[in-house]
Amino acid sequence: MIVIGDFNSNTIWDKLHRGHSHSQLVEKLGSFRLVSAYHTLRGEIQGQEITPTLFMYRNLAKSYHIDYAFVSPAISRSCELLIGEPSEWLHKSDHMPLILTLSI
């Protein structure tokens, strides 16, 4: 199973969104045995992402990680996830594409 898209959330905003926080979303998806491909592959912690997926108003100084690919653990061990480079994509959108390649 794969759930991918713009979730408009990150654990950095959990306190602002009590009752429907990002951590609760990750927990709920975990109950369906789904994990973040990005965090699994890169070994990063939710809320401490190095690579942003959004540049608010296309401003490089206002970057956040709010787009995710949640996948089953089996898929997470055999996939590749790339996030588009701002130099290539920022003129098209404030969100960078998530490119999930599956090994079948």
Where do the PLM segments sit?
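Surface polyanion/phosphate-binding segment centered on an Asp-His-Pro turn
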Residues: 91-104
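A short pocket-lining beta-strand/turn micro-motif at the edge of beta-sheets
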Residues: 62-66, 77, 96
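Short proline/glycine-enriched turn/loop segments at secondary-structure junctions
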Residues: 56-59, 87-91
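Metal-dependent phosphoesterases centered on the DNase I-like endonuclease/exonuclease/phosphatase
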Residues: 1-66
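Low-complexity, intrinsically disordered Gly/Pro/Thr-rich segments
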Residues: 76-89
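Short loop segments at secondary-structure junctions
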Residues: 73-76, 102-104
